[in-house]
Amino acid sequence: DIYIRAVRDTFGDIPVVVANDGDVSALAGAMSLGENNILGIAMGTSEAVGYVDENGNITGWLNELAFMPVDANPEAMADEWSGDIGCGVKYFSQDGVIKRAPRAGIELPQDASPAEKLKAVQTLMDSGSAAAEAVYRSIGVYLAHSLALYYGYYGFKYVLLLGRVMSGRGGDVILEKCREVLADEYPE
């Protein structure tokens, strides 16, 4: 309850809730669309996922899809924290962008922070770099297949994508490629 105490110490006895950013993204989607049955995915430092069910409730489920396998290739990237391969966090986060950059021919400064490395790829994207676009297209392909997998668990009607990875032109490319793959591979 460290966060609740910090708020009370600073602002007094006001209502406060500490929530997962994935749950907040799903709730934001439900509120902005005026709809329910929404999967919210925040792609930033990690992949955060939340779900608002068909009745408009945050389920309270443990939606840690960051550690759900989305790539079964034995050569898939390994997550340093869990040791598992092919985890969503390696595809739908700033780390996903950073790990794909060298494969697309982009050299990033080794001494830069992860946020600075993401910004460098975003800057390349804004300047029209084909290599940076390839990074975001790849993420869009993985996202499409992962959404089909996630759908099997949640049966969502809407998806809201947020976070630094989805900002700017790169996010547009992710969404475009994701829609294309969904239409081709999962037309239903």
Label each residue range with its predicted role.
Residues 1:
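Conserved phosphate-binding loops in N-terminal lobes of ATP-dependent enzymes
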Residues 8-16, 28-37, 54, 72-188:
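ATP-binding/phosphotransfer module of carbohydrate and carboxylate kinases, centering on a glycine-rich
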Residues 18-20:
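Short loop/edge segments at beta-strand edges and connector loops
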Residues 22, 45, 165:
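Active-site metal-binding loops of divalent metal-dependent hydrolases
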Residues 26-28, 40-42, 47-53:
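Short beta-strand scaffold segments in enzyme catalytic cores
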Residues 48, 67-69, 96:
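Generic structural signal for residues positioned in beta-strands
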Residues 52-69:
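Eukaryotic endomembrane system proteins
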